[in-house]
Regions:
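N-terminal secretory/targeting leader peptides
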Residues: 3-4, 14, 20-29, 42-141, ...
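Extracellular mucin-like PTS domains
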Residues: 33-37
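A gly/proline- and charged-residue-enriched helix-loop-helix capping module
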Residues: 142-152
Length: 360
């Protein structure tokens, strides 16, 4: 029998716990029930989808095997295939095989590939309003924001502007934490002088600048080596990403600050989408909704296990007190004003998001 490591045991345990809750396109993790909630595949050998034609989608993303995005995308592909008797197939290329997230989105817009999933907002900057620091602090609040009429409006704007359709908006990985190789971060002043990696996202840059750090942009696929060689002192990512990419090998100090979550838009080329029969569009939408729910369940169940992996690796994890968190929250308030001034959102939209959060 192949020996399983502690790290993989923690991850597999979380995946198995979540698996029982998903239906393919609606509730169960078993691919044998994949068509149960989607438009049903024909019974008795009468394949109604044959007349609709065969279609194949190439979908890219940046996360490695074991990450909730990777697992949920594989499940999505299985569900769509089962729900259409194999006439609609999905080829998923994870781990950045098709390029950086920006490059993949450019390929989607150009029609080179049919879709990508990931927190890439260069062509959809107003989605950044959901990444304002300390906007939400529970799963219920995050879900309410991403399923809100405001989110639907912003997605529709993005679709009209860049030639894509956003078929799902879920969580990219859970709440994001700070780490660095120099010293513990317990207060905003501890970030001063640190060179923190960002992915170029405006709200991350503004947050670190408000906290006194300098920033350097490094692609996600290059981040491990950038941290190892000292191109950056630190970074921010959710626990599942820290675990999956083994950043704990090149970072010593972690702070569980829960400062931000990222939407995880699933983009599909609009021209390709419009070429699909309506029945296939409905199946993709239903299976994408189930995928998003499954993804978020995996994040919630795996985040603590991933945090344990980081601790087990010998890293220091600091959990700020309520007063210490308040100091961080107060320090980043200028980020809200800057986002309004740059047209990412309006003051009224900030108030609407805060109302959604308060009611969740």
């Amino acid at each position: 029998m192949k020996k399983i490591s502690r790290r993989n045991f923690l991850k597999v345990s979380g995946v198995m716990a979540a698996a029982g809750a998903l239906a393919a396109c609606g509730g169960s993790s078993s691919s044998s029930t994949a068509a149960s909630s989607a438009p049903a595949a024909a019974a008795g050998g009468d394949d109604k989808f044959a007349a609709l034609g065969d279609f194949n989608l190439i979908i890219g993303h940046s996360q490695p095997e074991g990450n909730p995005r990777f697992i949920s995308m594989e499940k999505f592909a299985e569900d769509v295939k089962a729900a259409t008797n194999g006439h609609l197939t999905i080829e998923v290329y994870g781990n950045g095989q098709l390029g950086t997230e920006k490059e993949m989105l450019e390929q989607v817009v150009a029609g080179t590939i049919q879709g990508m999933r990931g927190g890439q907002f260069d062509f959809s900057p107003r989605l950044l309003m959901f990444t304002l620091p300390f906007l939400a602090n529970t799963r219920e609040q995050v879900t309410a924001l991403l399923h809100s009429d405001l989110a639907k409006k912003v997605c529709a704007e993005a679709e009209a502007a860049n030639g894509t359709v956003i078929v799902n908006l879920c969580d990219a990985g859970g709440y994001r934490q700070f780490s660095n190789s120099k010293h513990p971060i317990k207060a905003p002043a501890d970030l001063k002088g640190l060179k923190m990696r960002t992915n170029g996202m405006k709200t991350i840059d503004l947050t670190f600048q408000a906290l006194g750090a300098t920033t350097t942009s490094i692609p996600y696929s290059d981040l491990y080596m950038g941290l190892k060689t000292g191109v950056a002192d630190g970074q921010e990512n959710p626990w599942v990403n820290v675990d999956g990419m083994k950043f704990y090998e090149v970072q010593k100090y972690f702070t569980e600050v829960n400062y931000q979550f990222h939407p995880d838009p699933f983009y599909i080329n609009a021209a390709f989408w419009n070429s699909l029969p309506q029945e296939y569009q409905e199946i993709i939408t239903q299976c994408a909704d189930a995928m998003g729910t499954y993804n978020d369940e995996l994040i919630d169940q795996n985040s603590n296990a991933s945090k344990q992996v980081v601790a087990y690796a010998g890293c220091e994890i600091y959990e700020p007190t309520a007063d210490e968190l308040k100091a961080f929250q107060e320090a980043v308030q200028p980020v809200y004003d800057q986002c309004v001034s740059e047209g990412i959102c309006t003051a009224e939209e900030i108030a609407e998001m805060q109302k959604i959060v308060a009611g969740a």
